[in-house]
Each structure stands twice: as C-alpha cells, then as structure tokens.
UniProtKB/Swiss-Prot annotation:
This is Theromacin. Keywords: Antimicrobial, Disulfide bond, Secreted. It is found in: Secreted. Disulfide bonds join 2-9, 24-28, 31-73, 39-47, 57-59. The keyword Aminoacyl-tRNA synthetase does not apply. Its main location: secreted. It comes from Hirudo medicinalis (Medicinal leech). Signal peptide: none annotated.
Length: 75
C-alpha cells in the first residue's frame, strides 16, 4: 500500500514532520550520526495518485547503525 512508499521526504507529509517524525536531515544526523540527509526522487509504485512527486530519504556518510534506543528514530 501507500505506507511502503511514504517517507519523511514526501511533499504531502512534509508538514507533518516534527518531534515524532523527524525531517530527513535531522533523522540522518541524530539516528545515524551521518553528515546529512537528502531526499531523492523515488516515484511511488504502490500509490502514484496519492503520492505524486514522491521522494525517499538517503543518509550521507552514516557512521552508526540506527539508534533504536532513541524513540524519535523508530519511525
């Protein structure tokens, strides 16, 4: 369904980011100790009409595995 394609970079969900749903850049820096996070084009295969211009998050130079002890990294 749509959830598999939905990401912290999806334009339609970007306004919903915040404490519980970090932006791509914040997610990568905090959860992976990465230099930065960037969004790249990733057309939705499951939900193209609900997620036009879909994007996914990519962490640049991640130094650690995801910090699962931090609740804001779980999503």
């Amino acid at each position: 369904g749509c959830f598999e394609d939905w990401s912290r970079c999806s334009p339609s969900t970007a306004s919903a980011t915040g404490v519980l749903w970090r932006s791509c850049d914040s997610y990568c820096k905090v959860c992976f100790k990465a230099d930065r996070g960037e969004c790249y084009d990733s057309p939705s295969l499951n939900c193209p009409h609900r997620l036009p211009n879909n994007k996914q998050c990519r962490c640049i130079n991640a130094r650690t595995a995801k910090d699962n002890r931090n609740p804001t990294c779980w999503a």
